């Protein structure tokens, strides 16, 4: 019997983890809010991470991947306001310095520290200010919320989540913080996430579990189809619960946390007014289902229709048709929640006002059944509003 219960504490919910934040004015020299944060395991830990698939990788991504090889990382240093991306050799040096300064603060070796940055691309990191910010960090068991707030950029709220799991083998906890609101597309984008657990998990298993869970959460979200240079998801495990759970229990707990954080990111998308789950079923295979679902979710015309509360199914079927998957437009069905828009490729007889009422909701589901095979895939996405355009006009 497995009992999973939501709890407070974010990354500090798991035993032996502390976090903290400080402000140093990274973006413009003015200390308006916290913009440096740290998550730290007070005991030895194992680690796993996944990074952006963008071929243009930021310096912190490269340094973290290098430090991850040892698999014994205990701390993550994070900053907002500057991505440290496309900054050349100096950027790599700065990322290493951030790890070294953090290691000095916490009594670690530099390679025990991973580094994450988010913010503007192509701007040198103001290391004099960053050094002061790191020196001012005072991690505590109550620091998760401040840490989550410090890594926000265009986010409108801090994102944290944690669960406690009770099993026949004992109890353990999993928690996390995340940021992200724009440049969100499958394979992660402009999103950072740090996860912690006090479960005792061997490192090879930890890495496999993180990869699997990310595939079913953060890689299922898309807001604007753009992919960042800085995506990072990190999982630290210190085993302090003395519980070595069955993998089914750990998988369920990890998935609850990653999926909750992923949904928060989509809900907080720039200018978002609607959260939409898009599921394609009956595709020739899962790969084609994914292609079709992502085509619908990233279609500008579809997203604009959602913004206006318009159940325009023609744009949905059009997106499926141009994305390259097998489709028979004489058999496809489309549903908004459980109301049929299309049956066998033609308009269903559902009253328009009922369909419009669903499309006007803050959250609804679009299902497309291609009736060609057993392939299925879902993604979480949003509408596209004038506010999104305003937020991305530039400075």
Predicted regions and their residues:
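A structural signal for small-residue-enriched, beta-sheet-centric alpha/beta enzyme cores
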Residues: 1-79, 83-93, 104-395
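Generic structural marker for isolated residues within well-ordered, non-membrane alpha-helices
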Residues: 99
């Amino acid at each position: 019997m497995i009992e999973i219960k939501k709890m407070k504490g974010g990354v500090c919910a798991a035993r032996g983890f502390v976090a903290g934040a400080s402000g140093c004015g990274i973006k413009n020299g003015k200390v308006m809010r916290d913009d440096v944060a740290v998550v730290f395991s007070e005991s030895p830990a194992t680690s796993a991470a996944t990074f952006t698939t963008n071929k243009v990788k930021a310096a912190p991504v490269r340094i973290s991947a290098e430090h991850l090889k040892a698999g014994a990382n205990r701390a993550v240093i994070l900053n907002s306001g500057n991505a440290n991306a496309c900054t050349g050799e100096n950027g790599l040096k700065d990322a290493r310095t951030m790890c070294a300064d953090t290691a000095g603060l916490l009594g670690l070796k530099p390679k025990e520290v991973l580094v994450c940055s988010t913010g503007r691309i192509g701007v040198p990191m103001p290391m004099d200010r960053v050094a002061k910010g790191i020196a001012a960090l005072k991690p505590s068991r109550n620091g998760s919320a401040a840490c989550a707030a410090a890594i926000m950029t265009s986010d409108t709220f801090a994102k944290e989540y944690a669960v406690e799991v009770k099993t026949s083998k004992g109890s353990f906890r999993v928690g996390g913080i995340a940021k992200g609101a724009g440049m969100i597309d499958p394979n992660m984008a402009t999103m950072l996430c740090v996860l912690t657990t006090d479960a005792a998990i061997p490192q090879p298993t930890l890495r496999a579990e993180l990869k699997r869970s990310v595939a079913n959460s953060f890689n299922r979200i898309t807001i604007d189809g753009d992919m960042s240079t800085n995506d990072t998801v990190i999982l630290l495990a210190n085993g302090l619960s003395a519980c070595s759970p069955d993998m089914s229990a750990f998988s369920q707990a990890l998935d609850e946390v990653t999926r909750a954080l992923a949904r928060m990111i989509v809900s907080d998308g720039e200018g978002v007014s609607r959260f939409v789950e898009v599921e394609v079923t009956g595709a020739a295979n899962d790969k084609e289902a994914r292609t079709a679902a992502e085509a619908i979710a990233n279609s500008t015309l579809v997203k604009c229709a959602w913004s206006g509360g318009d159940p325009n199914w023609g744009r949905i079927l059009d997106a499926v048709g141009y994305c390259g998957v097998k489709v028979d437009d004489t058999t496809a069905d489309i549903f908004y929640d459980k109301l049929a828009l299309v049956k066998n490729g033609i308009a269903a007889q559902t009253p328009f006002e009922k369909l419009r009422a669903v499309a006007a909701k803050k959250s609804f589901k679009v299902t497309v059944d291609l009736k060609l095979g057993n392939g299925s895939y879902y993604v979480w996405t949003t509408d596209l509003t004038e506010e999104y355009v305003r937020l991305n006009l530039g400075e």
